[in-house]
Amino acid sequence: MAICGYGPVGSLCSLLMADYGYKVLLIDKNIGTSPTARAINTDGEQLRIFDKFGLAEKIIENSNQIEKIHFSKKSLEPIQSITQTLGDSSMGWPNQVLFYQPELEGFVREVVESKENIDVMELCELTDFNDKGNEVEIICKNKNKEIKFLSKFLIGCDGASSFVRKKLNIDLDDFGYNQK
């Protein structure tokens, strides 16, 4: 199993797949944790998954619970507001918590790196992939050298500018936010 993207989604996905017994290759074009916080929020449902790997309490201790969430367009015109109670939800975890992405990635990466059936290749940019029927040919560039892998599956967790999504012609609703 190959996973493109070593951010919060890709790293957690790799843990889940490894837990199901898959040998996982995790590739990312960058090295280290994200220097900026693009993901900032998680909820009780996701905390249940973090708990599976012993991370929920650590994330909660290093986060802040929030009562109100406001979604807006680039022009700051409101799209939706949600008010919820503070404290634990019916799932036993806080409804919403704000976290700092580089810190959260560090917590998850510690667990990823402890797994024998997860291999990580950073500075490895996915440049192409091809469906070969029962497997996927994965083509990457690492230090200007082309590398090819075969994998049963490829999961794209490579963010908003996802190469995987674009190659598969999967639409993205873009609200036009400047990520800088």
Predicted regions and their residues:
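N-terminal Rossmann-like FAD-binding beta1-loop-alpha1 element of flavoenzymes
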Residues: 1-26
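Short beta->alpha hinge that forms the Motif I/post-I loop of the SAM-binding pocket
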Residues: 29, 42, 160
